[in-house]
């Protein structure tokens, strides 16, 4: 459960993400593909080379979806319902992959935000991204 302080930190840090959605998203995906190569199987039609337009475009979609979740911290289930349906019923993505991408996104935040990425921010984002992963996994049950 996100506390009021967690929500405040998430909103503050998200302001620093704005304008970098495509870069941060692409970097998180590339990190995931390198660290967890099995995740590439969900993208057989993508050019998985560094900086490809497809990775950049999908990365932007991912981070934009996270931004929509940030705007709806008190109602993540509703905010992510369509994405949950898409990933569960159409794409059939193994839910463990949401956690893997979350870890990679945390690394991207830490790299780019430097001293602003405090232990408190890390903890808040860990809770937030875990909640997002849980919501995206709801339809699998």
Swiss-Prot record:
Role description: Involved in oxygen transport from the lung to the various peripheral tissues.
Binding-site residues, O2: 58
Tissue expression per record: Red blood cells.
GO molecular function: haptoglobin binding; heme binding; metal ion binding; organic acid binding; oxygen binding; oxygen carrier activity; peroxidase activity
CDD domains xref list: Hb-alpha-like (cd08927)
Subunit record text: Heterotetramer of two alpha chains and two beta chains.
Protein name per the record: Hemoglobin subunit alpha-2
InterPro entries according to UniProt: Globin, Globin-like_sf, Globin/Proto, Hemoglobin_a-typ, Hemoglobin_oxygen_transport
PANTHER family given in the database record: HEMOGLOBIN FAMILY MEMBER, HEMOGLOBIN SUBUNIT ZETA
Residue ranges occupied by any Globin domain in the UniProt entry: 1-141
């Amino acid at each position: 459960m996100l506390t009021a302080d967690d929500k405040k930190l998430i909103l503050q840090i998200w302001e620093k993400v704005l304008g970098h959605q495509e870069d941060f998203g692409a970097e998180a995906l590339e990190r995931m593909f390198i660290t967890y190569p099995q995740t590439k199987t969900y993208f057989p039609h993508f050019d998985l080379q560094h900086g490809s337009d497809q990775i950049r475009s999908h990365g932007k979609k991912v981070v934009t979806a996270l931004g929509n979740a940030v705007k709806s911290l008190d109602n993540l289930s509703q905010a992510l319902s369509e994405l949950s349906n898409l990933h569960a019923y159409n794409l059939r993505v193994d839910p463990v992959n949401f956690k893997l991408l979350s870890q990679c996104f945390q690394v991207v935040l830490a790299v780019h935000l430097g001293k602003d990425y405090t232990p408190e921010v890390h903890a808040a984002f860990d809770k937030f991204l875990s909640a997002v992963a849980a919501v995206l996994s709801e339809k699998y049950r």
